[in-house]
Regions:
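Helical scaffold of the NTase/Pol beta-like nucleotidyltransferase catalytic core
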Residues: 63-133
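Boundary detector for helix-to-coil junctions that initiate low-complexity/charged tails
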Residues: 1-93
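Active-site nucleotide-donor binding segment shared across nucleotidyl transfer reactions
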Residues: 121-154, 305
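Tryptophan-centric aromatic hotspots in well-structured domains and transmembrane helices
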Residues: 132, 137-139, 147-150, 315, ...
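Catalytic metal-binding acidic patch
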Residues: 144-166, 317
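Conserved catalytic core of two-metal-ion nucleotidyltransferases
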Residues: 101-125, 170-225, 229, 238-333, ...
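Surface-exposed, flexible loop/turn segments at secondary-structure boundaries
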Residues: 139, 164, 212-214
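Beta-sheet entry/capping signal
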Residues: 130-131, 155, 312, 319
Length: 382
């Protein structure tokens, strides 16, 4: 019989048991080698994890040592700096108020920001609209009675119904405008009070608050959870969108209306879990709006008595409303707010390219040179 035919027939027949055992032995050897490699890798990973754990423990120890040295040096410094018949806090205030001021374009920006804040404050008083300073504005008002030298912006809390009144008053007045920008990085909804002059880079940040009844602590926690859910949803929904690419969107961007619907739905969900009130009547506290930028440290809950019975702190001659327990607020927000700051030399001002253009400089000088009521082009027409 043809040998080629015989070979073909053998190829169609089942393999012998001896051949099958041979294949099985080879496979077992391969599996054993693979398992050995996996086991060796696992041991190597375990050893690497042990090394990493030791390094983390050493880093924690170093950090604790550095914290101790920093705190100890701070105590010794204040004792050396303190004058006769001067308390430690008086010495600290003297130190902070004696720090060098901003210079150059940043000084101009701070001056123009302060002027816009003055106009904002007067506008609110004229229309019976209440607000409170917050964040670095409260810290600067207490420590420096001015901007923190390495800070540039004005931060304001405003109850949601007061914000609505402000928006209406601004539309009817014509000298100012309220702008909205959605920020992908945080993400958050930036609401700002600005001059009608679009060349003016200055702004007052407006952070909405909501009145609540019931336990303010519970409401604060629920609001924090809703904020997290809101952020997770829009991060997922708009990943890969023009918003994620452009980072900041505003005006007529088609995504704005969709984002506002997302926000409205989450505010409704929050209202189902927390008793949100339209005004301060019957309120026990305030919670931060879920559209606001996140805090580094939680500063709440805010009790109604501390905020409706507010006091003022001086900020460049402006009597800025702040909660009556502003020291407690600052402690929660910043920890030891009288400690020597670690970012005096590393904290960056607002980007120069944002404020240093000739148009921006002219607009800032314009708002400083008059009562802020002129509109762009007035000086050219004169």
């Amino acid at each position: 019989m043809n040998s080629r035919l015989i070979a073909g027939i053998k190829g169609l027949l089942p393999i012998s048991s001896r051949s099958l055992r041979g294949f099985r032995v080879q496979d077992d050897a391969r599996y054993a080698q693979l398992f050995q490699v996996i086991n060796d890798q696992r041991k190597a990973l375990d050893k690497a994890q042990e090394s990493l754990d030791r390094l983390e423990e050493q880093c924690r120890g170093l950090n604790e040592t550095l914290e101790y040295i920093h705190d100890s040096n701070g105590v010794m410094y204040w004792q050396l700096f303190r004058g006769d018949h001067e308390t430690t806090e008086q010495a600290q205030l003297r130190f902070f108020r004696g720090l060098p001021k901003a210079e150059g374009i940043h000084a101009l920006f701070q001056d123009a920001e302060a002027r816009l804040f003055e106009l904002f404050d007067q506008f609110c008083r004229d229309h019976g609209i209440s607000y409170w300073g917050t964040g670095g504005t409260v810290l600067g008002a207490f420590r420096q009675q001015d901007f923190i030298p390495w800070d540039d912006d004005i931060d304001v809390y405003i109850a949601r119904e007061q914000l609505s009144r402000l928006e209406t008053a601004v539309r009817e007045d014509g000298r100012f405008r309220i702008t909205v920008v959605w920020d992908w990085y945080v993400p958050c909804k930036q609401i700002r009070f600005r001059s009608i002059d679009e060349d003016n880079p200055c702004f007052v940040d407006l952070f909405p608050l909501d009145w609540v009844s019931g336990d303010p602590e519970d409401a604060w926690q629920v609001c924090t959870q809703e904020r997290m859910q809101f952020v997770q949803e829009i991060r997922k929904q708009y990943a890969g969108s023009s918003w994620s690419r452009d980072v900041y969107i505003s005006g007529a961007d088609p995504l704005i209306s969709a984002l506002e619907l997302n926000l409205h739905r989450h505010l409704e969900d929050l209202a189902d879990r927390v008793s949100i009130l339209p005004t301060a009547d019957g309120a026990t506290g305030l919670i931060r709006g879920i559209e606001n930028i996140d805090e580094v440290r939680p500063s709440g809950p805010y009790l109604t008595g501390d905020w409706t019975g507010s006091t003022t702190l001086p900020f460049r001659g402006i009597a800025v409303p702040v909660p009556s327990n502003y020291r407690e607020y600052l402690s929660k927000a910043y920890g030891d707010y009288m400690a020597l700051p670690r970012d005096m030399h590393s904290h960056e001002h607002v980007a120069d390219e944002y404020i240093a253009s000739p148009k921006s400089v002219r607009a800032m000088r314009r708002i400083l040179s008059d009562d802020g009521e002129r509109t762009p082009g007035d000086e050219e027409r004169r």
